[in-house]
Amino acid sequence: MKQIIFDCDSTAGIPGYPMDDALALFYLLGRPQEAEVLAVTCTFGNGTTEQVYRASRDLLSEAGWERLPVICGSSQGEEPVSDAARFIVEETRKKPGELSFVGIGSLTNLYGASLLDPGIFDRLKEIVLMGGYTAPLLYHGSHLDELNFSVNPEAAAWVLNHGKNISILTGNNTLEPSYLPKEEFYTAMGQNEAGRYLAEK
């Protein structure tokens, strides 16, 4: 089973904001035999860090996952060392070689953690990121900018140059999710708490 620190800029629940990060989180929460999410660490991107923190906390509480820690990172333009960065360092010290870092927002929190403790990259089992692109990002005929690395390019460059065991899913891989009709989605997802919550939404 993978033990995961889930680092995101989820804004699900805020009118007019995207919910893709929340879908990724609930995908993991719906597979307790395969993955254990230890905490959600919040960064900026889709919204401010404070918006992401409140939205993530409210979403998890509404869905019955209020016991899952939600930890705030630094805001855009601030020093990258934060509660989220310190949490990442502490958890990797407790479980060296066991934790997966999944980052689907800016890489500010992992960057901040590495500034606190450069040995963190040796203690993480793997780093899985969403960012970059290998072809133009087209959505409904419009060109999209890069989705995550460009939000904090200094942090992204640092992690990509110093991190180890990195896997990257580009925007081209993640832009076009497949959707089932509502009835089929409910049947497929309604077997666990996370799936039922998403199906009902």
Annotate each language-model stretch with its function.
Residues 1-201:
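N-terminal acidic, glycine/proline-rich low-complexity segments
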